[in-house]
Amino acid sequence: PLLISQLVRIACLQMALQPVWEGLKDERWSPQQLAVIENQLAKIDLLKGYRISLLGERDFANLMIDQMGDNPKSAGMLLENDGTIPGYWLIPQGWIYHLQRRLNEMHVKFSQRIVDPKARRIRPDIAVTFATEVQARSSRSFPIFDVLSSMLLPAIEKVAIKIGSSQTAVDHTRTACLLELHKLEHNKYPAQLTDLKTPFP
């Protein structure tokens, strides 16, 4: 799984949540239907999905870099060299390893820390620092050791923020279903969320 799969997942969720809210507004859902919807929403963990897809991005990048080391022509293709520029096959192995180290350094220091699935937190401060560092690396006059970082890392912080807002939308919808279930059972909304039978998100 890659980040693009999470973006597609978010797009599908946005379309799926709209009719749920319309049904809640018009009080069309039965208790059984609400229970099914709430149960399905409870299984959705976009923060965990982000982390899994980010590890996939990192593993995919490392695979490409390994292929660059094994086959110099792969490096030429990745760097958009169609072979008309001589000497791309002379790229030293040490340079490739340094590219790999710099790329993984960005993942370990920043992108993998933007989202904390266990604490259920998004860290915008780390996302901003990450974006600033990517920009600084790519804007150097001769970013020879950050070529891959510039190509493979941009926009990760935006995806993390989007995933956070989408998970919030899922949690809000689930909470609304629990509130409606309580209302159907007791003919009124609970005085506080802790009165719900199922712990709210």
Regions found by a protein language model. Name each.
Residues 1-201:
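Short acidic linear motifs
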